[in-house]
Regions:
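Terminal amphipathic alpha-helical/low-complexity segments used for targeting or macromolecular assembly
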Residues: 1-82, 193-225
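Left-handed beta-helix
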Residues: 82, 87-88, 93-94, 99-108, ...
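Intrinsically disordered, low-complexity regions enriched in small/polar residues
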Residues: 46, 58, 116, 121, ...
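C-terminal segments of enzyme domains that contribute to small-molecule binding surfaces
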Residues: 132-151, 155, 181-225
Length: 225
């Protein structure tokens, strides 16, 4: 009797779900530190941005483990419940903060670094329909304001800020502020150091983020090949 069970895939799924659980713990730590309205641990139960991020992490675990149907099912549930559209193939480092979440769109080849805050209505999308890398790479400790659109395979440097409703179609340097349509650099400070409160914790978040994100990127490359 032939058993249609791929134990290798199941083993990989278990490992990815464990990674997702670790990432969610780091997400909680960042949310507590970065959301000024956060008052008590019970808010995790009602914070739509955090809950949608948690669903993304689960869908991503299924996606990179080649359980595509279940990955897209969870992705669709996320869209219905929270109006958040994060493709399960996207790579979000542990420690991303989604504030409100409503209308957020993140494409399949996008990468987002830890400490980054994404407000409602943000789009990390493509400029053209093409194969390969076509969505933004957002560094660490970036703020992307409400309604901002970052389009194409552009790079947003660490500690950068994108103004609300801006449309970014070119790279933004580290520490810079970009506003407008199309976005222009209005402030540039490449020597700006990371915000210290993001890194002083009992959890070594960036090391954990590096390890998990490298694994996810390697898995994603295999899936997209």
């Amino acid at each position: 009797m032939h058993l249609l069970v791929d134990f290798g895939k199941i083993k990989k799924l278990i490992a990815e779900l464990i990674n997702a659980s670790k990432a969610i713990k780091i997400d909680k730590e960042y949310l507590r530190r970065l959301d000024s309205s956060f008052e008590s641990s019970y808010q995790y139960l009602f914070h739509a941005g955090f809950r949608s991020l948690r669903l993304y992490r689960i869908s991503h675990a299924f996606y990179v483990s080649d359980f595509k149907f279940l990955a897209y099912l969870i992705y669709h549930i996320n869209r219905i419940l929270y109006t958040v559209d994060i493709h399960p193939a996207a790579v979000l480092e542990p420690g991303v903060v989604i504030d409100h979440g409503t209308g957020l769109v993140i494409g399949s080849t996008a990468v987002v670094g830890s400490g980054t805050v994404l407000y409602h209505g943000v789009t990390l999308g493509a400029k053209y329909i093409t194969k390969g890398k076509r969505h933004p790479t957002v560094g660490r400790n970036v703020i992307v304001g409400a309604g901002a659109k970052v389009l194409g395979p552009v790079y947003i440097g660490d500690n950068a800020k994108i103004g609300a409703n801006s449309v970014v179609i070119s790279d933004v340097p580290k520490g810079a502020t970009a506003v407008g349509i199309p976005a222009r650099i209005v402030f540039k400070n490449s020597t700006e150091s990371p915000k210290p409160h993001l890194f002083h914790s009992t959890i070594d978040k960036n090391d954990a983020g590096d390890e998990l994100c490298h694994k996810k990127e390697n898995n994603l490359k295999k899936v997209l090949m």
